[in-house]
Amino acid sequence: MAEPRKSGLISHGIAAQNRKARFNYTIKDTVEAGIVLRGAEVKSLRMGRATLSEAFAGERDGEMYLFNMYIPEYQGGVLSRFDTKGPRKLLLKRKQIDQLLGAIARQGSTVVPLDVHFNPRGLAKVTLGIAEGRKQHDKRQAIAKRDWERDKARILKNR
């Protein structure tokens, strides 16, 4: 039996991660939201070419949007052009929007995207984190703890 052809596209699973978000922020809560994308944006995202490092979520006209998420143009011969860093609408219920806006207003938190993934049905979703910024000494402690965990695992492995 012949193997299925691998196209290099992501049908489900993580398409892009914001690794710096977990380092620069303390994540208090997470929310999963749908994201409105056009066809060429979805194709480019399925190729795993998105960047979330400068992205953030915010409110505009009572709706939540994702700003500064970079999705490069799809090079597959599609004529439709799109703004690579334009705002993208997030699909959330009103209760979730109120929860996010309340956390931003009350606690001085921010909403950062942690990852963009495709669920088992093939729909694009973004995981948002309600986050507080870390101080420099907290970042140093996180680095020291991570290094110690790595060294401890290495020592236990070599026993």
Swiss-Prot record:
InterPro entries: SmpB, SsrA-bd_prot, SsrA-bd_prot_CS. GO terms for biological process: trans-translation. It is found in: Cytoplasm. GO terms for molecular function: RNA binding. It comes from Acidiphilium cryptum (strain JF-5). It comes from the Bacteria. This is SsrA-binding protein. Its main location: cytoplasm. Required for rescue of stalled ribosomes mediated by trans-translation. Binds to transfer-messenger RNA (tmRNA), required for stable association of tmRNA with ribosomes. tmRNA and SmpB together mimic tRNA shape, replacing the anticodon stem-loop with SmpB. tmRNA is encoded by the ssrA gene; the 2 termini fold to resemble tRNA(Ala) and it encodes a 'tag peptide', a short internal open reading frame. During trans-translation Ala-aminoacylated tmRNA acts like a tRNA, entering the A-site of stalled ribosomes, displacing the stalled mRNA. Keywords: Cytoplasm, RNA-binding. PANTHER family: SSRA-BINDING PROTEIN, TMRNA-BINDING COMPONENT OF TRANS-TRANSLATION TAGGING COMPLEX. Belongs to the SmpB family. Gene3D superfamilies: 2.40.280.10. GO terms for cellular component: cytosol. The keyword Transcription does not apply. CDD domains: SmpB.
